[in-house]
Amino acid sequence: MDRRDLLTGSFKGNDLNLGSSSDSLYAYAKLLGSSDSGMVHYCLEGTIFAYLPSGAIPLIGFRSILKHVWKSLDKETCRYDSYESGFFHGLNSPEPITEFNNPVTNEINILSEIRGGPYHKEISSDQINWERSGDDVWIQEPNTRKGHFGISRDDEKLEYAFANSIFRGKLSDLNDSSTTSPSVMTYNFVSPWYPFFQMENIEGKMYWQAVGTKIQSWSNVPHSIQKFLDQKNDNFFGSAKPWKKRTSTLQFYRDSLEK
């Protein structure tokens, strides 16, 4: 595939070669998002576990929408900004909750919202590592993070977290002339306790696990998420820039304490 094909996505058949820099970059953009500029969304459903010395205990469920705002491909890189909006829910219901009975501490916890972004990502072809089994292809994106996980960013204690996102699809879908393809996302995140769980004196970590799919329209969004986003009234789904100031679930919680 030549540069013109890369920029237009105009190729068909069995020509895609993931060992080629231009093909790999095109396939990456198409699998994760779009080979053209525009927005794509993932609906995520997951569970947070308390990972204790005695084993893992399910704490709470969560649902969110992950938004990628993709820029047009160039010869060297692909770029996008990401945002996330969502909520926590009980283990037996998909409806949002603002507090829950922590099964580890037997205390009532007041919860935050799930919110993140804008996060900017730029990736070149030499950073992309494909795995393939028959028609199945996937990419892993491990990420070690270092930061302050307590109730204040002024806490001198630096701790580590680890996230791994996996995007999986079909080579045959990447090989057509469309600008986007179906994708399944698996997300895993291990970190110190977030302060709203009030477990800073308990040995262990929290483990977030979620699975989601790339969706094509608002009608594909689960009703509980539609209702949540409508109540937020920030046009999250339709806007390419739903908010300006960078935040995270942890920072959003900290900011809420100051209001």
Predicted regions and their residues:
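N-terminal secretory signal peptides and thylakoid transit peptides that target proteins
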Residues: 1-12
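A short, Trp-centered hydrophobic/proline-enriched beta-strand micro-motif
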Residues: 34-47
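Short, solvent-exposed loop/turn elements at domain surfaces
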Residues: 51
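Predominantly extracellular/secreted and cell-surface proteins with exposed
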Residues: 55-183
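Domain-length functional cores that host ligand/cofactor binding and catalytic or interaction surfaces
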Residues: 154, 159-163, 168, 172-208, ...
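Edge beta-strand at a domain terminus
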Residues: 190-259
